[in-house]
Swiss-Prot record:
Belongs to the UreD family. The keyword Chaperone applies. Required for maturation of urease via the functional incorporation of the urease nickel metallocenter. It holds the Pfam family UreD. This is Urease accessory protein UreD. It comes from Rhodopseudomonas palustris (strain BisA53). The gene is ureD. It comes from the Bacteria. InterPro entries: UreD. GO terms for molecular function: nickel cation binding. GO terms for cellular component: cytoplasm.
């Protein structure tokens, strides 16, 4: 008796192109929500989360609301993309922070992208106070802030960027860091700035006009802001451990920081922010 022939099965092609394989391994995350004032208290109204980015809301204290972003990917690698879109409704009080310092890892070529959109309605106050962003050597990242502040609204936005892990004896020698900030008030562009550091970043940071050899920089943007506020912020000068410049123009104030490491820079920033009347997130105090 003849042995029956087995049906021919075509093997499944499981190979992926290099670009498709790379895309399949990239982290993507998005958080979008808005808050409204209800019975004198700020409450979350709408929330969307996707991918590796999540947000948690600690127990509210007083009339304000706090939100904490969590990157479940554990960091940002080359080609990852994250987006945040937050709207604070009229009369609300919202503080935003992160669960930990954000780490931007070494890239083999692709650039990571972070897009942050903030909208602050009349009578509202939004405080953007994440923990520092740490760039590893050969990291590549592009970050964009699009901020719309209504007349009569208040904004405090503070960012710290650290080039390398000083505690591990590491410094960022090369890579790419592009940081774009656009601030509009009442629909009118008030402030536009793009910071671009690429190539031999270590050598550029050594220049006196850039970081004077420091490994950490920071910026605090305050709306509204005037010379009276600047004078009050400058009272913290006796506590500074790095270099700090504070000025005001066009209805807002700005403080720029530079220090040898993140510890000194954070201390300087806390000394300044403490004079704005803002309550710093508890994670900043640990």
């Amino acid at each position: 008796m003849a042995t029956p022939r087995r049906p021919r099965v075509n093997p499944i092609d499981t190979t992926l192109s290099e670009s498709a394989l790379f895309a399949a391994n990239r982290a993507v995350g998005e958080v979008s929500f808005d808050v409204q004032r209800v019975d004198g208290v700020t409450r979350r109204n709408r929330l969307h989360e996707s991918g590796s980015l999540r947000v948690r809301f600690p127990s509210p204290e007083g009339e304000g609301l706090s939100a904490m972003f969590v990157n479940t990917a554990g960091g940002i690698a080359g080609g990852d993309r994250f987006a945040v879109d937050i709207a604070a409704g009229e009369g609300t009080r919202l503080t935003l922070t992160t669960a930990a310092a954000e780490k931007i890892y070494r890239s083999n070529g692709p650039t990571s992208r972070l897009d942050i959109a903030l909208k602050v309605a009349a009578g509202a106050a939004l405080h953007w106070l994440p923990q520092e962003t740490i760039l590893f050597d050969q990291a590549r990242v592009e970050r964009r802030f699009e901020i719309d502040v209504a007349e009569g609204a208040a904004l405090l936005l503070a960012e710290i960027v650290v080039f390398g892990r000083a505690a591990m004896g590491e410094r960022m020698l090369s890579g790419s860091f592009v940081d774009r900030w656009r601030l509009r008030r009442g629909g009118r562009l008030m402030f536009a700035e793009t910071v671009r550091l690429d190539g031999d970043i270590g050598q550029k940071l050594a220049r006196p006009a850039i970081a004077n050899g420091g490994a950490a920089i920071g910026t605090a943007l305050i709306v509204p802001g005037d010379e009276k506020l600047v004078e009050r912020l400058r009272e913290a000068a006796q506590h500074f451990r790095g270099e700090v410049g504070i000025s005001a123009w066009n209805g807002f104030a700005m403080a720029r920081f530079c220090a040898q490491d993140a510890v000194r820079l954070r201390a300087d920033m806390m000394a300044v922010l403490g004079r704005t009347g803002a309550a710093l997130p508890r994670l900043w105090l640990n």
